[in-house]
Amino acid sequence: MNTHRPIESVRAHEPAVLNAAFNQDQTCFAVCHESGFQVYNTDPMELRMKRTFSTNGGVGLIAMLHRTNYVALVGGGRQPRFPVNKLCIWDDLKKKPSIMLEFMSPILNVLLSRILIVVVLKNKVLIHAFESKPKLLAQHETYDNEAGVAELSVNEQTSFLAFPGRAIGQIQLVDVSPAHRDRNLISIIKAHKSRIQCLAISNSGLLIASASQTGTIIRIHDTAKCSLRFELRRGLDRATVTSIKFSPDDSKLAVLSDKNTLHVYNLTAADPQPESAMANRLHLLSAVPLMPTYFRSVWSFVSYHIDTKDDAVNDCGVLGWADNESIVVLWKKKGIWEKYVLVENDKWTLVREGWRRFEE
């Protein structure tokens, strides 16, 4: 029997969620809206901090720095708190801006580490030192990147910055580890035939996953040699992949698209065995020589189709992992947090364990 309460329509007086993002280890997340921003613990979901601006409070982009008092803010919404081309590093202990950086065009994404501030513009990625007067360390040109696609890993041994290349379908992978940053080591991965839509780097920094605007294939390369490790099929129809995320131990990959289906793939073996309880699905003709790529594709070992209502059509979900068996989805239009758990019975299934609405 289904004992879950139905999800209500978003009430008109609730602040519209303009963006949502997890911190580096996904133990916290932040949401921003027309009047400020909030920070929550991921699991259990608990409000940790709420900042409401009395006037012109719209925040369109937010990025956390681990569990510190610093968050990166960019204005957005109907009445932006800051210009869309200006980055504010907000110090919530002092409740005021700590650093302000201005650029020549709108900021599309911001990524933080303890030593770096990365700003993504339409055709450029800029890397600054995270200090009181940030020094520009490097800048890289990209193909048109209107979605602000970029990913930064913060592993102590292997730190990488990934973003679209200068040619369609390519990924630029920059080694930003403190030991290598001055050498400006850049690798090019020819990942797809169409534009890069979504990126994710594993927690170990050893793997990078990517989806193109076609949205049918997810490819995973290793960061050391840029060689292809996995080719995963999401589906046959075109789709916009909104979020990709590796599990904390790198053993699984979660993928969410605008088809409202959450897929999970097993990455523990490059050639999953059919007898494995957690094996990905393979096409029956996959072993036949010279078969087209479709028949040799690896499919998710478990998936969940998420019911939607009219007010949540084209909603954009953001993925995070609470642990190696639990996935959290942040929904912007619905303004809710959802938790899904991998459960093994006769076969693996995804179970929707709970949901909560973001506070007003």
UniProtKB/Swiss-Prot annotation:
UniProt record, GO biological process: protein transport
WD repeats: 12-50, 191-231, 236-275
GO cellular component, one term: cytoplasmic vesicle membrane
InterPro entries named in the record: PROPPIN, WD40/YVTN_repeat-like_dom_sf, WD40_repeat_dom_sf, WD40_rpt
SMART domains: WD40
Cellular compartments annotated: Vacuole membrane; Cytoplasmic vesicle membrane
Cross-referenced SUPFAM superfamilies: WD40 repeat-like
Main location: membrane
Coiled-coil segments: none
Keywords associated with the record: Cytoplasmic vesicle, Membrane, Protein transport, Repeat, Transport, Vacuole, WD repeat
Topological category with respect to the lipid bilayer: Peripheral membrane protein
Entry domain remark: May contain a beta-propeller domain involved in specific binding to phosphatidylinositol 3,5-bisphosphate (PIP2), leading to the association of the protein to the membrane.
Role: Involved in mitochondrial or peroxisomal functions and amino acid signaling pathways.
Similarity comment text for this entry: Belongs to the WD repeat PROPPIN family.
PANTHER family: WD-REPEAT PROTEIN INTERACTING WITH PHOSPHOINOSIDES WIPI -RELATED
Protein name as annotated: SVP1-like protein 2
Lineage summary: Eukaryota, Fungi, Dikarya, Ascomycota, Saccharomycotina
